[in-house]
Amino acid sequence: LLKDLIPFIEKNYPVIGNRENRALAGLSMGGGQSLNFGLGNLDTFAWVGGFSSAPNTKMPAQLLPNPAEAKDKIKLLWISCGDEDRLLGISERTRDYMIEHKVPHIYFKEPGKHDFQVWKNDLYLFAQLLFVKK
């Protein structure tokens, strides 16, 4: 992602190649990896979303060991999950850590399970907030 995909995209497509114009989001296992990579590389990503993040998601203190830095760098941190999703606890523990450390984020719990109906809605809502100047 960092060494191959981003350089390829920046070389072959007309994109603005800086962190303020780069987002990362995913669902389920991809949601966990989006949080892991996005929050672990705040010099590369400013907009991060995890939808129904899976057990591969790092523990919150590992995800964000320096909350003060994150407060300055994150433009949007989106955490969402269905209220009947068996993985809800992963999103909740991440949300709780962000609240405890006063890291700005959006937590969205909605009716639903671990399925595409929930994720389509999450992506739609998340996308409305991307690259918006505050």
What are these regions (language model features)?
Residues 1-134:
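Non-catalytic cap/lid and distal C-terminal segments of serine-dependent acyl enzymes
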